[in-house]
């Protein structure tokens, strides 16, 4: 029985495909969905933050513009050469600055005067010039510049969401940045990969506020996660393959057992009933196999018994068909001898009784070759009484050959055929030569009788294959059919003859089956 188990392999592949690949697809879909949702949320957050920051800056700008408009007349009455007016101006400007939701610095510059709240002397080049205004004072006109260093909202966005702010002009020159990776005054070149950003217009000068986020760290985290997932997937594949193989073995164990039992049943080695290890619907198939095997065995035994009986009947029938004409002729001879030579008639009766005892023996269909030869000698002796000792019988055989076992009445028909068809007015010499070779007994029966013509020889050869009960020609046909029944195709019978030269019959009997009582 072949060791290849395609059903187990198919089941293992199916289990593997139905468990590992769905898990893998779920993980991949989950990861892609996670990043898609993450990108969508970040875009939404950036959009919200940039709009909030724009509103905050617009509010500051509006507050400053309102302040300038409201205090324009009062500034014209102040003289910045006067110490008290300078203090009043500082107080108003600081009040404006402190009211705004941003870190602002102002610079008020004019003739021989410079006022600022940048007491720490921070570099205003790193700040965004929020607005510029000309203020008229009593003694002269001054320039007011307001710088934005930061806003609480931008700081909160930077801290909580790691989103950074840029302000650029219409030529994309960076005017403000709360990220050290950008330098004020340089061109802003947005990155195509690893960054998310959104911009809005701030003022009539076409300055734009840009909120952006660097997602390289998230991508690196994603790559790390992918590596971890790949390792987990490899382990999952190995575990899944082993699990699928074990599960396939468990699921197909009973099926393989049933296939093995079918193989044993086919070779008639099934044995007694044994249930399957697992209680399942397959037990019905298992029961059916044993029932079918038992029915098949009973049928085979019945057929074998019938065949044996048929062979016995055929052999008996064949053996009986050898006798009638011989018995009739012998009885006529005895009748003739009773009046002519009672003593010789008594001898013939004794020989005939021994022959009948031999041929009617029912306990076995096999005999020693020596017994068959004795039977033939008695048969020839009776025939010589009829034909005035015209028949000369010569037997050439070794002692070893004489003790071999053959089927009963396997040689007598050859002698009967030689006497019946070879005898003429002259004497008839019959030679029986027995030799052993390769577990076969080779029998050569040669006579110097009248022989056969080519057409007659062809007819006799063809008649050997006729059915034993259909042909009218007994003798060799019966012997050939009996040999086929008892020995099968291993037995061989060949006939050679020439007109007026005699007949030679070569007969091969397998000794390996001759010892079997059929």
Swiss-Prot record:
Return the Pfam families for the record. Answer: HATPase_c, His_kinase
The UniProt record lists the EC number as: 2.7.13.3
In the record, which positions carry Phosphohistidine?
A: 325
Q: Which GO terms describe its molecular function?
A: ATP binding; phosphorelay sensor kinase activity
Top EC group: transferase
> How does it get modified after it is made?
Autophosphorylated.
An annotated GO cellular component of this protein is: plasma membrane
Highest taxon, organism lineage: Bacteria
Q: Subcellular location, in the record's words? A: Cell membrane
Q: Which residues form the Histidine kinase domain?
A: 297-513
Reaction(s) catalysed by this chain's protein: ATP + protein L-histidine = ADP + protein N-phospho-L-histidine
Record key words, sorted:
ATP-binding, Cell membrane, Kinase, Membrane, Nucleotide-binding, Phosphoprotein, Transferase, Transmembrane, Transmembrane helix, Two-component regulatory system
Task: Give TM regions.
Answer: 20-40, 222-242
Q: What does this protein do?
A: Member of the two-component regulatory system HptS/HptR that regulates genes involved in hexose phosphate transport system in response to changes in extracellular phosphate sources. May act as a sensor protein kinase which is autophosphorylated at a histidine residue and transfers its phosphate group to the conserved aspartic acid residue in the regulatory domain of HptS. In turn, HptS antagonizes CcpA-dependent transcription of a subset of CcpA-regulated genes involved in antibiotic susceptibility.
Task: From the Swiss-Prot or TrEMBL record, give the protein name.
Answer: Sensor protein kinase HptS
- Which source organism? Staphylococcus aureus (strain bovine RF122 / ET3-1)
Point out the gene that encodes the protein. hptS
């Amino acid at each position: 029985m072949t060791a290849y188990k395609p059903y187990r392999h198919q089941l293992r592949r199916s289990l593997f495909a139905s468990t590992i690949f769905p898990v893998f697809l779920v993980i991949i879909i989950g990861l892609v969905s996670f990043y898609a949702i993450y990108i969508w949320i970040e875009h939404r957050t950036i959009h919200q933050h940039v709009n909030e920051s724009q509103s905050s800056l617009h509010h500051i700008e509006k507050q400053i513009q309102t302040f300038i408009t409201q205090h324009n007349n009062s500034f014209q009455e102040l003289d910045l050469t006067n110490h008290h007016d300078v203090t009043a101006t500082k107080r108003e400007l600081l009040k404006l600055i402190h009211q705004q939701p941003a870190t602002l610095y102002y610079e008020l510059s004019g003739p021989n005067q410079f006022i600022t709240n940048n007491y720490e002397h921070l570099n205003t080049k790193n700040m965004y010039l929020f607005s510029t205004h000309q203020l008229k004072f009593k003694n002269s006109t001054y320039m007011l510049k307001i710088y934005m260093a930061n806003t609480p909202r931008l700081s909160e966005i930077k801290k909580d969401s790691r989103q950074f702010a840029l302000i650029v002009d219409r030529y994309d020159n960076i005017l403000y940045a709360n990220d050290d990776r950008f330098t004020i005054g340089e061109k802003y070149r947005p990155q195509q990969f690893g960054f998310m950003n959104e911009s809005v217009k701030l003022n009539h000068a076409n300055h734009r506020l840009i909120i952006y986020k660097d997602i390289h760290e998230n991508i690196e985290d994603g790559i790390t996660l992918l590596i971890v997932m790949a390792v987990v997937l490899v382990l999952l594949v190995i575990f899944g393959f082993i699990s699928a193989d074990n599960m396939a073995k468990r699921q197909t164990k009973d099926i393989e057992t049933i296939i093995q039992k079918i193989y044993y049943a086919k070779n008639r080695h099934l044995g007694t009933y044994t249930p399957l290890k697992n209680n399942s619907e397959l037990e019905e198939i298992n029961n059916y196999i044993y029932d079918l095997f038992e029915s098949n065995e009973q049928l085979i035994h019945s057929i074998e018994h019938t065949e044996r009986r048929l062979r016995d009947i055929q052999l008996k029938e064949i053996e009986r068909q050898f006798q009638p004409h011989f018995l009739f002729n012998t009885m006529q001879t005895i009748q003739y001898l009773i009046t002519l030579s009672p003593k010789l008639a008594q001898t013939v009766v004794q020989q005939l009784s021994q022959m009948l005892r031999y041929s009617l023996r029912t306990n076995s269909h096999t005999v020693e070759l020596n017994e068959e030869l004795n039977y033939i000698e008695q048969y020839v002796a009776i025939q010589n009484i009829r034909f005035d000792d015209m028949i000369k019988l010569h037997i050439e055989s070794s002692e070893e050959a004489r003790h071999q076992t053959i089927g009963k009445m396997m040689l007598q028909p050859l002698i009967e055929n030689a006497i019946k068809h070879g005898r003429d007015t002259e004497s008839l010499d019959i030679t029986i030569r027995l030799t052993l070779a390769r577990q076969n007994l080779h029998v050569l029966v040669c006579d110097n009788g009248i022989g056969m013509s080519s057409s007659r020889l062809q007819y006799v050869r063809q008649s050997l294959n006729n059915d034993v009960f259909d042909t009218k020609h007994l003798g060799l046909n019966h012997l050939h059919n009996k040999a086929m029944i008892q020995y099968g195709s291993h037995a061989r019978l060949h006939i050679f003859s020439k007109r007026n030269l005699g007949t030679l019959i070569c007969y091969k009997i397998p000794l390996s089956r001759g010892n079997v009582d059929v």
